[in-house]
């Protein structure tokens, strides 16, 4: 397995697909990376030369991926919570942040149903 940005990418898959195993790189970003590194998108990872892998690594190092990206998103959420913005309060309470209704659904964000006794009638 080739290692790029601290992630083992699968050898049997095409380079475009295997780059998406890195957190922060989707298909369009993977295509841009390969274009910058002058590597064909159709080649398999096992067929890449060391030179091509090195060029891909250099280009990926220019992007914010994996741990750095996760850290930045967590810090952004913490900052929202510290300044007590509306979004920060929603994060703190574990409710949907982007304006969704919560009367009926939002179970993923709120967690399992907490049954209240004698609610009927």
Swiss-Prot record:
Region (Disordered), start-end ranges: 91-121
| Domain of life from the UniProt record | Bacteria
List, in alphabetical order, the GO biological process terms annotated in this UniProt record: translation
Keyword Manganese assigned: no
| A Pfam match | Ribosomal_S13
Return the InterPro entries for the record: Rbsml_uS13_C, Ribosomal_uS13, Ribosomal_uS13-like_H2TH, Ribosomal_uS13_bac-type, Ribosomal_uS13_CS
Q: Is rRNA-binding found in the keyword set?
A: yes
The protein's UniProt keywords, in alphabetical order, are: Ribonucleoprotein, Ribosomal protein, RNA-binding, rRNA-binding, tRNA-binding
Name the GO cellular-component terms. Answer: cytosol; small ribosomal subunit
> Per its record, what are the GO molecular function terms?
rRNA binding; structural constituent of ribosome; tRNA binding
According to the record's subunit comment, the protein's assembly and interactions are:
Part of the 30S ribosomal subunit. Forms a loose heterodimer with protein S19. Forms two bridges to the 50S subunit in the 70S ribosome.
Role played: Located at the top of the head of the 30S subunit, it contacts several helices of the 16S rRNA. In the 70S ribosome it contacts the 23S rRNA (bridge B1a) and protein L5 of the 50S subunit (bridge B1b), connecting the 2 subunits; these bridges are implicated in subunit movement. Contacts the tRNAs in the A and P-sites.
Q: Which family does it belong to?
A: Belongs to the universal ribosomal protein uS13 family.
The molecule here is called: Small ribosomal subunit protein uS13
Organism equals Staphylococcus aureus (strain NCTC 8325 / PS 47)
> By which gene is this protein encoded?
rpsM
């Amino acid at each position: 397995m080739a290692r790029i940005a601290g992630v083992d990418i699968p050898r049997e898959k095409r380079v475009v697909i295997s780059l998406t195993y890195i957190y922060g790189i989707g298909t369009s970003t993977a295509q841009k990376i390969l274009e910058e590194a002058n590597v064909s998108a159709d080649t398999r990872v096992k067929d890449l030369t060391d030179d091509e892998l090195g060029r891909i690594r250099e280009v990926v190092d220019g992007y914010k991926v994996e741990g750095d990206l996760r850290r930045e998103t967590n810090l952004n959420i913490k900052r929202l919570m510290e300044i007590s913005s509306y979004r920060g309060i929603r994060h703190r309470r574990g409710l949907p942040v982007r304006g969704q209704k919560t009367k009926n659904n939002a179970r993923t964000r709120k967690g399992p149903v907490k049954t209240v006794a004698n609610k009927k009638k």
